[in-house]
Amino acid sequence: MNVEQQANAEQIALWNGAAGQGWVDAQESLDRVLEPFQHRIVEAVAARRPQSVLDVGCGTGSTTLAVSRLLAKRSTAVGVDISEPMIALARARAEREKAPPRFICADAQTHAFEPASFDMIVSRFGTMFFDDSVRAFKNLRRAAAKGAGLAVIVWRSAAENPFMTTAERAAAPFLPDMPARRPDEPGQFAFADRGRVYAILEKSGWSDIDIRPLDVECTLPLAELTTYLSKVGPASRAIQGLDERFHARVIETVRAAFDPFVHGTEVRFVAACWTVSARND
């Protein structure tokens, strides 16, 4: 096992298995849900007009593609992610672009990027999964040119994001062995603590650190909710392989738990996040 495989081994296995395939299957729904954050990242890039941008944890490539369209042929956009299924879809989507970005299947925590090769590093919910965040952001800073900007969006706490944990809470009585989330482990809410995020960036050498709360209403067509619940999140993975009737019962219970978020033909919820910016001096 090489150094890159040793680091983040659990996350690499997760995102190259059920989690990664689930995001591939739900790509269109997820892109719609997360579109407001993609716009934020694109706005940040537009304000700086960089020549080269790295999108960390790019997933199926939506944000990287949007940045690439903005920059057109005069600049370069690169997406990196540990998930082979998601990178494969990102590359397939890129083939349809006039000025396609480049996608790398690698762990941004350890990958040997060309030093000082990017003058902006961005991420839409892709930086909370490192098993050594200081090491990861040091590695990203090595890839950043002098004066390069960092612009990432991360989730705040689970308590502030009830939509994101409703499925787990509703499914828990049926799935007693479903692992509980821990706030200090790699995962969706790993950067909920503002002070921890600040300390990670400071220790990894970034400067001019700014962390601000961001609350955004997100929407999903009601018709897509059941598919979304079946493909995304810990509960979706926990119910895989269950007896068909039991599986249907769990999904029915979980779906009913989302009724408070249903408004007509839409599902709406407020996403509580941090916008994080910094600079490589």
Labelled PLM ranges:
Residues 119-133, 156:
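A short SAM/SAH-binding and catalytic strip from SAM-dependent methyltransferases
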Residues 32-51, 66:
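Conserved alpha-helix/loop element of class I SAM-dependent methyltransferases that forms part
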Residues 134-135, 141-142, 146-220, 236:
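Conserved catalytic/acceptor-binding region of the Class I
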Residues 52-111, 135:
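Class I SAM-dependent methyltransferase SAM/SAH-binding core
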Residues 109-120:
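A short acidic, Gly/Pro-enriched loop at the edge of an enzyme's catalytic core
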Residues 71, 94, 171, 258, ...:
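Conserved hydrophobic residues forming the short capping helix/wall of the S-adenosyl-L-methionine
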